[in-house]
């Protein structure tokens, strides 16, 4: 049955307008993005097939170009459209961080980082740079390693802080394994960077590790920093 034959309250677009986006399922939201289905399948049915194929909405949104474009019903035009939407979302979120509010809550930092390094297949280490009032300046990715290890040079960390005139930093990296629990090497690295930052009188406020499914670990929240 075509979506146009559904009851008005069940059609994704009409449902969103009447009840709001939070009331739609992942498949319904994706169907609005897709706009049309394929032969024999409505946009909602195609959307559900794609979610099943990728395993989750998060994995679909973060799929690389090759994996995304080879899926039935998608393609390069949709890939470009999706990346543009995600980039607009990131810019919108970051614009709200630059309006004078201190960025010290681990939850908000983790949300920021999801836009940058969430669900990457390789480990990425970066810095959230803050000013004297702990207001957001910029996120700077610094090092990319293998799935199991990122090589971090403290000299480059300090140079980045000085180049951006940051007064405080939050360390950040992802665990592609999905488990955000820090390893002993994560703890040792954090301590070494913290000592280096002290030499240039820069505060290290936290180290956030991202896992999967929205999980994250805060060194400050756990009393390590």
From Swiss-Prot:
Phosphoprotein: present as a keyword of the record? Answer: no
Motif extent (JAMM motif): 173-186
CDD domains reported in the protein's UniProt record: MPN_DUF2466 (cd08071)
Per its UniProt entry, which superkingdom is the organism in? Bacteria
InterPro entries for the chain: MPN (IPR037518), RadC_JAB (IPR025657), RuvA_2-like (IPR010994), UPF0758 (IPR001405), UPF0758_CS (IPR020891), UPF0758_N (IPR046778)
Q: Where is the MPN domain?
A: 102-225
Provide the binding site for Zn(2+): 173, 175, 186
What Gene3D superfamilies does the record point to? 5' to 3' exonuclease, C-terminal subdomain, Cytidine Deaminase, domain 2
Q: Which GO terms describe its biological process?
A: proteolysis
Query: What NCBIfam families does the database record attribute to this sequence?
Result: PRK00024.1, radc
What is the recorded name of this protein?
Answer: UPF0758 protein Tcr_1917
